[in-house]
């Protein structure tokens, strides 16, 4: 395994640990999710380039589209929560309330 693959896996692991440690604020959780998605994108692109599998070349772009949709929904949720409650704590999100 090359050093580039190890760095990308380490970036994913650091983002995952950050998501598990700093899950009290919505903004930090969203940033960690973005780091995870970007490391998955780079890993998928490198894997497809190394394997010369041209049929799957659209997969990283589709992953990037879903990451952009996730970021837009996350930021709209952040704006809604901060306008409603005044903070961005994840504890304020309760699925039993409308």
Swiss-Prot record:
Taxonomically, the superkingdom here is Eukaryota
Give, as one word, the top-level EC class. translocase
Q: Which GO terms describe its cellular component?
A: mitochondrial inner membrane; respiratory chain complex I
Subunit field text:
Core subunit of respiratory chain NADH dehydrogenase (Complex I) which is composed of 45 different subunits.
Which reactions appear under catalytic activity for this entry? a ubiquinone + NADH + 5 H(+)(in) = a ubiquinol + NAD(+) + 4 H(+)(out)
**Membrane topology per the record?**
Multi-pass membrane protein
Q: Name one GO molecular function term.
A: NADH dehydrogenase (ubiquinone) activity
- Write the record's keywords in alphabetical order, separated by commas: Electron transport, Membrane, Mitochondrion, Mitochondrion inner membrane, NAD, Respiratory chain, Translocase, Transmembrane, Transmembrane helix, Transport, Ubiquinone
Membrane-spanning residues where?
1-21, 29-49, 61-81
Q: Name one GO biological process term.
A: ATP synthesis coupled electron transport
| Protein purpose | Core subunit of the mitochondrial membrane respiratory chain NADH dehydrogenase (Complex I) which catalyzes electron transfer from NADH through the respiratory chain, using ubiquinone as an electron acceptor. Part of the enzyme membrane arm which is embedded in the lipid bilayer and involved in proton translocation.
Name by which UniProt lists this protein: NADH-ubiquinone oxidoreductase chain 4L
Q: Which gene encodes it?
A: MT-ND4L
- Which Enzyme Commission numbers does its entry carry? 7.1.1.2
Family affiliation: Belongs to the complex I subunit 4L family.
Subcellular location field: Mitochondrion inner membrane
Tell me the leader sequence span. none
């Amino acid at each position: 395994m090359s050093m580039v693959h190890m760095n990308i896996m380490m970036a994913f692991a650091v983002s995952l640990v950050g998501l598990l440690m700093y899950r009290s604020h919505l903004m930090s959780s969203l940033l960690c999710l973005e780091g995870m998605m970007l490391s998955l994108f780079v890993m998928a692109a490198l894997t497809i380039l190394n394997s010369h599998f041209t049929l799957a070349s659209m997969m990283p772009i589709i992953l990037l589209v879903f990451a952009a949709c996730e970021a837009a929904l996350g930021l709209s949720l952040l704006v809604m929560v901060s306008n409603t409650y005044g903070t961005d704590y994840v504890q304020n999100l309760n699925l039993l309330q409308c």
